[in-house]
Amino acid sequence: MSTGATSGVLVAVCTTHGVRDDGGRAGRTGIDKRPRTGPVAIADDVLDGDLVGDELRHGGRDQALYAHARDEARRWAIELGREVPPGWFGESLAVDGLAVTDAVIGQRWRIGGDRLGAAVLEVTLPRTPCTTFSRWVEEPHWVTRFTERADVGAYLRVVQPGTVKAGDVVEVVSTPEHGVTVRQLFTRTDPAARSRPGPGPQGRGRGRAGPRPGRARNARRHRPGETSTIPLPDRHPTDRMTS
């Protein structure tokens, strides 16, 4: 990863291989994702062929896609002593050569060679590891380890639907000036986060490092069709857009 890079490569586009039974509240999960061959369409809130097992906590406008960086996956592969192929983290987009967890909230990416058919995506939220993720990975203390590493990847919303495929260039086309990154929002280490109430609907943990807002607010945020309630600076100043 290079935090100053303005482009990277889409290594794989991954969709649900099959909905699996899960011990969580939803009883099923679409976390098992595998790379697709050929072009894949991105619509307003979904990647073609992808499925969401728990629609209360996943999917929707601000979590239409999930991106994870291959350099972060390679670090986990070394630490875990196992292969970590694209899709293993449940990601829709496996990206190389571009900051994902260290992307600025509201940053926009254009993916695809044909600009008329390219997709434009906007970085929205960090991924919060859950028990479904832990059951899928089958590594001890996984939620704690993943949280402490904080290489969590980024959720994306669809600004412009399009078609993408493995090998496409991922180009940064705009970056908001507030500078708050996905990692900072997740760990609550940015100055703006310190001035806001901490996790949970009652504002527990003001100014304290830790994951992003608690389950009750997460559940509301994840419902399909709802608009974002993220308390952040302006995400997308148009004067930073490149052609």
Locate the predicted segments by residue.
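A structural signal for small-residue-enriched, beta-sheet-centric alpha/beta enzyme cores
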Residues: D151-V152, D168-V170
